[in-house]
Amino acid sequence: MIIYNTLTGIKEPFVPFSIDNVRVYVCGPTVYDFAHIGNARSVVIYDVLFRLLKLLYPKVTYVRNITDIDDKIINVAQNTNQSIYDVTAIYIKAFHEDMRMLNCLEPTYEPRATDNIDVIISLIQKLVDSGHAYVYNGSVFFNIESYSSYGQLSGRNISQLIYGSRIDIEVGKKHPGDFVLWKPATEIDNQLMSCWSSPWGLGRPGWHIECSAMSYRYLKENFDIHGGGADLQFPHHENEIAQSCCAFPDSRYAKYWVHNGFLTVNDEKMSKSLGNVLTVRQLLNSGITGELIRYVLLSTHYRKPLDWNSQMVASAQESLNRMYTALSSTNVDLSLDDSVELSSHVIDCLKDDINTPKAISMLHEMVTEINKTADMIEKISLTKTLIKTANFLGILQHSWQDWFKIDDNNQEISQLIDERKKARANNDFKRADDIRQLLLNRGIVLSDNKDGTTHWYKK
């Protein structure tokens, strides 16, 4: 397996610290609202990576955190007269429901920041004691000038970090690039109980230290892969490296850094001001299936930008319909036995830097072979491999009947299809076309197979 490492800027052979337990950490959601489609892209991409690693190695420990203490969470709690725990409980539950609809596996561990305050405080104290952090009026800041390799992930150097350059400016900082590890409690924090006792007084952790603490608790000083969106590369991931490597000088923290690309909607960045934030829940409620969402997210290479638009969704729908139509030609049972093997060609695509679009194109080549062959034994064998391999990618989870919402008791549609078949046999193509259009006007799409049969599905 080879993977692109943001830290080195090249694709590298994947060599884990231990083949007996591959360890992965991915930045998860901040739970103040429903997950949007950009959040979902990250979850789906690292779900495929998790599946692949589980195939290749005997044990994989996958940690995806939940940020359940944050300024945005506090704002929602304050505006809705709820506790932060009530707010986060709502959106954690929703996140889990939505990701299940996208057929994502659960991570091995899903720690919450508020359950790890003791680890966070211990790590901050370690940085203070070693001179890499300093205290000012109840705040604790990390001193970036104490870490000579700061900027290695993002390609920045300390001299570039001037006031106003994507960094928070706060009173008490020694350098404008220094970042907060611990914030003193405000009056609102006290009211909402969003603060904890510490050696520096009541307060709450900064965002960056949370991930360092949780990755350390579950994966220790060194682990194999750290994933997240490209927007997290700086400052979040850069700061994680700095504080973790300073807390544990003999460690390198994560060996491989993997970042998925940005997602836009109709060529525009998602933002509440534009009113174009698409949540997974909105899409599901609009009738777009979780499998279709997943297919769209996998149809572009994870490192490339992805633009969500109606044309892409329609194209993905047609592609999935084509796959399910191929299943209908053999009617193979979805519950396959272990003797059915995955397509080695598809797995090879995934082993080449998680190349999901190429893997999907290989699935469509299999569909073409299924449609071409007249040998039913070969057709069934190919169909079984298609189902097993597509399932590995998290798609083709339904029977073709369920996918096309077929109702076997709808005699009228069956009679019209039979009438159309007779019309075609008698070269009455106008009548055949009229019947097709009549059904189309009612939302029924016909799909003619090479063996002379016709299936239908609802738009």
Curated annotation (Swiss-Prot):
HAMAP family the UniProt entry points to: Cys_tRNA_synth (MF_00041)
**Motif extent ('KMSKS' region):** 269-273
Binding annotation for Zn(2+) = C27, C211, H236, E240
Q: What are the annotated GO cellular component locations?
A: cytosol
Kindly state which reaction or reactions the protein catalyses: tRNA(Cys) + L-cysteine + ATP = L-cysteinyl-tRNA(Cys) + AMP + diphosphate
**Enzyme Commission number:** 6.1.1.16
Q: How is the cofactor bound?
A: Binds 1 zinc ion per subunit.
- Family per similarity comment: Belongs to the class-I aminoacyl-tRNA synthetase family.
Q: Where is the motif 'HIGH' region annotated in this sequence?
A: 29-39
Q: Which GO terms describe its molecular function?
A: ATP binding; cysteine-tRNA ligase activity; zinc ion binding
Look up keyword Translocase and say if it applies: no
Its lineage reads: Bacteria, Pseudomonadati, Pseudomonadota, Alphaproteobacteria, Rickettsiales
Q: Which domain of life is it from?
A: Bacteria
Q: Name one GO biological process term.
A: cysteinyl-tRNA aminoacylation
Q: Signal peptide position in this chain?
A: none
Q: InterPro entries in the record, alphabetically?
A: Cys-tRNA-ligase (IPR015803), Cys-tRNA-synt_Ia_DALR (IPR015273), Cys-tRNA/MSH_ligase (IPR024909), CysS_C (IPR056411), Rossmann-like_a/b/a_fold (IPR014729), tRNA-synt_1_cat_dom (IPR032678), tRNAsynth_Ia_anticodon-bd (IPR009080)
Q: What class of enzyme is it?
A: ligase
**Name by which UniProt lists this protein:** Cysteine--tRNA ligase
Q: What does the subunit comment say?
A: Monomer.
